[in-house]
C-alpha cells in the first residue's frame, strides 16, 4: 500500500505551529484528488538556507514563506515573478525541475479579495495603516488598479518611501504621512477603504485599535490584515458604526488559494479552503 505522497509542500517560518495553512491546503489537495501533503517547517534564520537547499532532494514541490524569512529567502531563489520583485518579498516558492521561482501572493490575494467583495480600487480612496511587508504588497495592488492611496505609519520616512516607491506613476494620487491624530482624522475624512497592516489588535495589542470609533462611519469599508482574532477591536468598532468589515482570514485564504494554483495549475476550491481555515482557527483557540 502506498504511503509516500507524490509531492510535499509546506510552510516555512518561525514560529509556525498554529498556522491554519496545512488544514486548508491539505483539504484542497484532497478535494482535487491530488496525492500531495502540506506540512509546517519551523526554521530559524540560520536554518533557512539548508531548508531551501533540501527542496530538491526531499521532493518538496513548493513552499509558503512567512515571518521572518520573506525577504531573506530571496538570496536562495533562482528567479522572481514581477510582483515579488517590485515588493521585495516572497511568500510562495515553486520548485520547477530544480529551479526555484519566488512569488508574492500577498499582492494577488489582495486583488482577489477586492474583486470578490466588489471593491473597484479605481473608484476608491484607500488609507493604509502601516508600512511593513504586507503593506507593500497591498499598496502595489491598490496603485496598479488605479486607486488613490494614503499611507500612515509611525515613522513618516517609511510612509513616504512606500507611497513614493510603489506609486510613482500615479502622481498626485498618493501620499505618505506620519501616523498621528491629526493626519489620521484628515485622511479618514476623505477615504472609502481603511486597511490595517499593523499588529495593533493582535497578541499583546489585542483589544486595541489605532482608529477612534468617532472617525468610523457607515459608508466605509474596513479591512484588517489580522486574522486572529477574527474580529479585532477595529472591526468591532467599525461594525457598530455600520461600516462594512472584512477580516484577515479571507485575505489569508485568497493568498493560499493563489499559492495552490501556482503549484497545481488547478483552480483552488476557495470556499472549502475558507471553511477549513475557520475550523482550524477555532481548534487553535481550544
Curated annotation (Swiss-Prot):
Keyword flag NADP: yes
Keyword Oxidoreductase tagged: yes
Keywords (A to Z) from UniProt: Amino-acid biosynthesis, Aromatic amino acid biosynthesis, NADP, Oxidoreductase
Residues annotated for shikimate binding in this entry: 19-21, 66, 91, 106, 227
EC supergroup of this enzyme: oxidoreductase
Pathway the protein takes part in: Metabolic intermediate biosynthesis; chorismate biosynthesis; chorismate from D-erythrose 4-phosphate and phosphoenolpyruvate: step 4/7
GO biological process, one term: shikimate metabolic process
Residues that hold NADP(+) according to the record: 130-134, 225, 248
SUPFAM superfamilies: Aminoacid dehydrogenase-like, N-terminal domain, NAD(P)-binding Rossmann-fold domains
An example molecular function term from Gene Ontology annotations: shikimate 3-dehydrogenase (NADP+) activity
Active site positions, chain numbering: 70 (proton acceptor)
Reaction catalysed by this enzyme: shikimate + NADP(+) = 3-dehydroshikimate + NADPH + H(+)
Enzyme Commission number: 1.1.1.25
HAMAP family the UniProt entry points to: Shikimate_DH_AroE (MF_00222)
Cited function: Involved in the biosynthesis of the chorismate, which leads to the biosynthesis of aromatic amino acids. Catalyzes the reversible NADPH linked reduction of 3-dehydroshikimate (DHSA) to yield shikimate (SA).
NCBIfam families (UniProt xref): aroE (TIGR00507), PRK00258.3-3 (NF001319), PRK00258.3-6 (NF001322)
PANTHER family for this protein: BIFUNCTIONAL 3-DEHYDROQUINATE DEHYDRATASE_SHIKIMATE DEHYDROGENASE, CHLOROPLASTIC (PTHR21089:SF1), SHIKIMATE DEHYDROGENASE (PTHR21089)
Family stated for the protein in its record: Belongs to the shikimate dehydrogenase family.
Name of the protein this chain belongs to: Shikimate dehydrogenase (NADP(+))
